[in-house]
UniProtKB/Swiss-Prot annotation:
Protein function: NDH-1 shuttles electrons from an unknown electron donor, via FMN and iron-sulfur (Fe-S) centers, to quinones in the respiratory and/or the photosynthetic chain. The immediate electron acceptor for the enzyme in this species is believed to be plastoquinone. Couples the redox reaction to proton translocation, and thus conserves the redox energy in a proton gradient. Cyanobacterial NDH-1 also plays a role in inorganic carbon-concentration.
This protein's encoding gene: ndhL
Reactions catalysed: a plastoquinone + NADH + (n+1) H(+)(in) = a plastoquinol + NAD(+) + n H(+)(out); a plastoquinone + NADPH + (n+1) H(+)(in) = a plastoquinol + NADP(+) + n H(+)(out)
Domain of life the protein comes from: Bacteria
Entry protein name: NAD(P)H-quinone oxidoreductase subunit L
Coiled-coil residue spans: none
Quaternary organization: NDH-1 can be composed of about 15 different subunits; different subcomplexes with different compositions have been identified which probably have different functions.
Lineage of producing organism: Bacteria, Bacillati, Cyanobacteriota, Cyanophyceae, Synechococcales
């Protein structure tokens, strides 16, 4: 059974639901956490109290995606680790 016959045997509504789940999962696990990482990196020292509170809430909300990228991204403040 090839891929085209398998795809044609699945109803179109089911394929749309699978596509919607894939898009939402990609947003939740990949796109928003990466954007949040880079936002925090660029604004960390200039954030106000409310912005920091909102960022902490977003980190809590998107924690699974943040954990996916945490081992690969290292955003130390400049000057840290210099001897």
């Amino acid at each position: 059974m090839d891929l085209q016959s398998l795809a044609s045997s699945i109803p179109q509504d089911t394929l749309l639901v699978i596509l919607a789940y894939a898009l939402l999962g990609g947003l939740y696990l990949l796109v928003v956490p990466l954007a949040l990482f880079f936002w925090m990196n660029s604004r960390w020292t200039r954030m106000g109290k409310i912005e920091r509170l909102l960022v902490y809430g977003l980190v809590f909300l998107f924690f699974p995606g943040m954990v996916v990228f945490a081992p690969f991204l290292n955003f130390r403040l400049s000057g840290q680790g210099d001897n």
